[in-house]
Amino acid sequence: TDNGTDRSLSYPFGDETRNGMKAWAIDAGTHAPLLVSCPGTIPEGTQSDDLVDFSDFLPTIADIAGAEMPDVKLDGRSFWPQCQGKEGDPRKWIYQYYYPKFTEAGQPHGEGINGNEIAWAQNQNFKLYRDGTMYAVSDRGEKSPIVKNGAGERGETARAMLQKAIDSMPVWAAKLAYGD
């Protein structure tokens, strides 16, 4: 998504006007609609709220083309069935990593414009940062963190799943010198 629309721009979204939040890790900086068109194959008006990750594009394009995938482990999965209005194999979570610049940020996440590694996993309802801070996805501005054991059974189950996802990813501790 190139981390959102420029901050100087506003745009209509449903019944509200939203501001661009480029370089923020909140929903307005990372959430982008995916539009797919294939007249005669994709039923008009088909919509899906399934999560799609960039790694899903290779298997999806291969699926559309009927190409054989190499016998290698891929992180992505085809979302072509969902495009056709079928159930498919939707993701349970997505992982995002963002390291925008080479200086330290003033905040651990949210405003990442000045640097700072920001990593999180999210599902349809919850978003968990690597530092353990959790938000409801519906809290688009991330104003109300959910304390540990404060999300109810469904939320704490999601927290455990999302933490496992984060733990499965590498930690990028080495920083590059600017200009290298």
Predicted features by range, described:
Residues 31-32:
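Catalytic cores of eukaryotic secretory-pathway lumenal/extracellular enzymes that build
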Residues 35-37:
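Short beta-strand-to-turn element immediately C-terminal to the catalytic PLP-Schiff-base lysine
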Residues 165-179:
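Bilobed periplasmic-binding protein-like "clamshell/Venus-flytrap" ligand-binding domains
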